[in-house]
């Protein structure tokens, strides 16, 4: 939390919420513009977009590390005690309702994620620093940087894997059979494109294995660009 107090101010969190709001609108408009998708599936996609939850910077409730002993003289000892501390905490959580508000990453972590079973996106304070995010920068900078990351994570809710989960995080096919076939035909174009990339002599990318990330990159950039044009 001390890191977040210094590195991620409340006004920065408000700005991130604004960016996410705008990208959600852009994503909905992109879905509306899909000529191959039926009105039935679009309705379900709208419901999923509206149900997205977000975790920005740091959790609202911090569990802390009371009871964990840190010794400056023993790095190995600190690692051992930290692992034991976390293991005991996990044991105490057994049998309790799952807390969906917890973040799967610490505030200083430089990363972002989408959780299909919660239908939520997470952006720790660590990634909300330059060059990804700069509160004092103009829209062009932030939509180009963190905007693409936001778009990428939102898109994971509709890629080859995330699209199999509904707005409530249930593993449920909410697409019509025809729409799913249309999606898979288009996704196969991305698979074939990346199958053709030779990273080393005779070694090619597995486009099917990287499909979700590639869809996220393509669509994330597009969604962020259209959101920027309206900013």
Question: Which residues make up each language-model segment?
Answer:
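Intrinsically disordered, low-complexity linker/terminal regions across diverse proteins
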Residues: 2-231
């Amino acid at each position: 939390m001390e890191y977040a107090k210094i590195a991620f101010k409340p006004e920065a969190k408000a700005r991130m919420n604004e960016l996410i709001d705008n990208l959600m609108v852009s994503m909905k408009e992109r879905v509306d513009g899909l000529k191959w998708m039926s009105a039935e599936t679009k309705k379900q996609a709208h419901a999923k977009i509206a149900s997205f939850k977000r975790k920005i910077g740091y959790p609202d409730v911090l569990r802390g590390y009371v009871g964990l002993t840190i010794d400056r003289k023993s790095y190995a000892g600190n690692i051992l005690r930290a692992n034991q501390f976390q293991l005991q905490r996990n044991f105490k959580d057994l049998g309790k309702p799952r807390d969906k508000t917890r973040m799967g990453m610490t505030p200083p972590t430089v990363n972002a994620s989408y959780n299909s079973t919660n239908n939520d996106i997470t952006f720790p304070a660590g990634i909300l620093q330059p060059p990804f995010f700069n509160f004092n920068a103009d829209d062009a900078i932030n939509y180009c940087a963190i905007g693409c990351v936001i778009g990428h994570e939102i898109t994971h809710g509709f890629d080859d894997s995330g699209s199999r989960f509904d707005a409530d995080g249930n593993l449920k096919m909410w697409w019509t059979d025809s729409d799913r076939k249309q999606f898979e035909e288009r996704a196969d174009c991305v698979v074939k494109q990346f199958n053709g990339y030779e990273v080393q002599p005779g070694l090619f990318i597995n486009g099917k294995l990287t499909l979700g990330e590639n869809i996220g990159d393509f669509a994330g950039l597009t969604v962020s660009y259209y959101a920027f044009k309206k900013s």
